[in-house]
Regions:
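Short hydrophobic/aromatic-rich motifs at helix boundaries and adjacent loops
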Residues: 1-3, 29-30
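Enriched for short, Lys/Arg-rich terminal
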Residues: 2-3, 14-15, 20-23, 53-57, ...
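Basic, amphipathic "hinge/linker" alpha-helix immediately C-terminal to the N-terminal HTH DNA-binding motif
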Residues: 5-9
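A short, surface-exposed loop/turn module that caps and links secondary-structure elements
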Residues: 27-52
């Protein structure tokens, strides 16, 4: 599967880089979505799926072989 990041998700990732360990965990979780787009702990929220990674939530959309990272939020 192919993973792309929205502009908002990219900007948020950069903004949260003060927490490098947290963003590395987010990046690993996002890369793992290519192998398993519905991992244990991912919740469906409307047209999107939400994955919790430590204090962060990753909102993403699966469309065929394309995964779009829509947004990253801090809890």
């Amino acid at each position: 599967m192919r993973i792309i990041w929205s502009e908002i998700a990219q900007a948020t990732f950069v903004r949260f880089m003060a927490d490098q360990a947290g963003m590395m965990a987010v990046n690993r979780a996002v890369e793992a979505l290519a192998d398993d787009p519905a991992p244990l702990g991912a919740f469906v929220r409307g047209a999107y799926r939400r994955l919790r990674v430590g204090p962060y939530r990753v909102l993403y959309e699966v469309d065929g072989n394309l995964i779009t990272i829509v947004r990253i939020d801090r809890i």
